[in-house]
Amino acid sequence: MSGEKKSRHVMYKKTSRDKAVSVYLGKRDYVDHVDSVEPVDGVVLVDPDLLKGKKVYVTLTCAFRYGQEDIDVIGLTFRKDLYYARTQIYPPVEDPKALTKVQERLMKKLGNNAFPFVLEFPDFLPCSVSLQPAPSDVGKACGVDFEIKAFSTNNLEDRIHKKNSVRLMIRKIQYAPDQPGPKPRAETSWQFFMSDKPLHLTASLSKEVFYHGEPITVSVSVTNKSDKTVKKISASVEQVSNVVLYSSDYYIKTVALEESNEKVPSKASYNHTFSLLPLLAYNREKREIALDGKLKHEDTNLASSTLLKEGTDRTVMGILVDYKIKVTLTVSGLLGDMTSSEVSTELPFILMHPNPDGGAKESEQEDDMVFEEFARDPLKGELQAEEKEEEEDDEK
């Protein structure tokens, strides 16, 4: 209807300090659909008078940051580029390609000195993830991040000064699959020494995919035909982060836990339902918990599960995140608590954000464009870290 108000479509903009180059993006988050990844489609606005004959390039970089700068003293750099792509934007060197809806609207708005660019993500890169530092840690967190950078130069071999460049942090993200798998279910039996019959444990979930902030219901059934007594039952959500760089390291962190002190004596059965809620709010003091990548000082959440394209090598560099429910029975021993043992089983599941409705058609909407500057006023410590890194880039 003509009387309806148009929705607002935020366009993100950032300009170099010499005012010669500005980058415009229609969004900051790019979705990895497992089989394909949304490309970065943007526009660069140049001022030919200020460029004075310089060429303009745009790069896409995926970097793994170690987070702790003092690691450099042992001869290792604390940043490794996992992927780097560069294209010349001005003067144009390629035949113009079909424009996306966002590019069409931006170029119509910005005029003749606007030039489009498209940069593709390869399908082997991890998503934006970071490991939570301890409260006392300083500097950038260990993790994977993505950056768009535009700069002007006479020669690619020359040092790139920060006044001639503009950097924009973006994210590569994934959403929950549209077709989840079967309901997770696991069972185990344990035969104790000097006990004729086993202890049987069954655990199940109502579904495979859970959304951030959604309680996870775990159904547990214990059939104790052994001569032992089950003293305690616990259910936990474990986050498993596989950090792959020069070696493969695993970090297993409990992010939610519930216990029942209900005893299950010999020859008895017991059924119980646990409700677990894995939230970052309950885990802010824990170091090395994986978090979804964030932009500047925005808040984030526990990292989403990593979905990989079939056939992808799980040793791809970066951080891969999985989740599992672990159900544990603590069983009495011959000498009481001193010799108690544990019986456990695990249920892998997926923790992600739902795919937002209408997200696929965002670029086709005829809405009002609103320009928003990429923030130059983050928290003081983060601004100092960014400026320090830019100075280091200048020195390379």
From Swiss-Prot:
Entry GO CC: membrane; photoreceptor inner segment; photoreceptor outer segment
Signal peptide annotation: none
Name used for this protein in its record: S-arrestin
Annotated Acidic residues bias: 387-396
Pfam families from the UniProt entry: Arrestin_C (PF02752), Arrestin_N (PF00339)
InterPro entries: Arrestin (IPR000698), Arrestin-like_C (IPR014752), Arrestin-like_N (IPR011021), Arrestin_C-like (IPR011022), Arrestin_CS (IPR017864), Arrestin_N (IPR014753), Ig_E-set (IPR014756)
Membrane topology: Peripheral membrane protein
Job of this protein: Binds to photoactivated, phosphorylated RHO and terminates RHO signaling via G-proteins by competing with G-proteins for the same binding site on RHO. May play a role in preventing light-dependent degeneration of retinal photoreceptor cells.
Organism this protein belongs to: Xenopus laevis (African clawed frog)
Keywords on record: Cell projection, Membrane, Sensory transduction, Vision
Gene3D superfamilies xrefs: 2.60.40.640, 2.60.40.840
Annotated region (Disordered), positions in chain: 375-396
Main location: other
Subcellular location: Cell projection, Cilium, Photoreceptor outer segment; Membrane
Family statement: Belongs to the arrestin family.
